[in-house]
A protein has these predicted regions:
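Extracellular/periplasmic carbohydrate-active domains that bind, remodel
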Residues: 1-169
């Protein structure tokens, strides 16, 4: 899947505004979402999720000019080890097929309320690369504001106007 443009949308129902994965085995590239508004409660605004048994790539994903009211999980989340409850599935085997994740940009995003801000948790054996978050504003954050693991080349311009006392950095 490549060269996807999503723009000028108003979302009134759904669980993730832009979700990529989890069972991809080929690739996703050049995805752009711009000037969208989320009027409902969603789990996440941008979620990239991959399974270490599938391989493939995710590259050049941009979200620009998005407003949201309530995000019940993460404003942006990336996980390169997503499993769906099959016993033994969490073991990728001797030759895991890790997914290359690079070139993810989120800019000019405003969210009124989020449980968590930024959660980027990637594989230590194949770190994600080149993440840019520019002018991302969250009015209230209740748990982790920023958590980044195994990502090379991260640039964060993320503001939380109010972080609740039990939130972690």
């Amino acid at each position: 899947c490549e060269d996807v443009l999503i723009r000028d949308c108003t979302v009134n129902a759904g669980h993730t505004l832009l979700g990529i994965g989890s069972e991809l085995s080929a690739g996703v590239r050049n995805v752009r979402m711009e000037n969208c508004r989320v009027d409902c409660e969603v789990w996440r605004l941008l979620y990239v999720k991959t399974n270490p048994r599938r391989g493939g790539f995710v590259e050049n994903v941009t979200m620009d000019g998005v407003t949201a009211k309530k995000v019940t999980q993460d404003v942006i989340a990336v996980s390169s080890r997503v499993y769906y409850g099959m016993p033994g599935q969490e073991v990728a085997g001797p030759n895991p097929q890790l997914t290359r994740i690079e070139g993810v940009t989120m800019r000019n995003v405003h969210c009124d309320w989020a449980l968590r801000g930024v959660t980027l948790r990637c594989d230590p054996d194949y770190p994600a690369r080149d993440f840019r978050l520019e002018n991302v504003v969250i009015d209230e954050v209740f748990e982790n504001f920023v958590r980044v693991e195994n990502v090379d080349g991260v640039k964060l311009d993320v503001t939380a106007r109010k972080i609740h006392p039990d939130a972690h950095w």
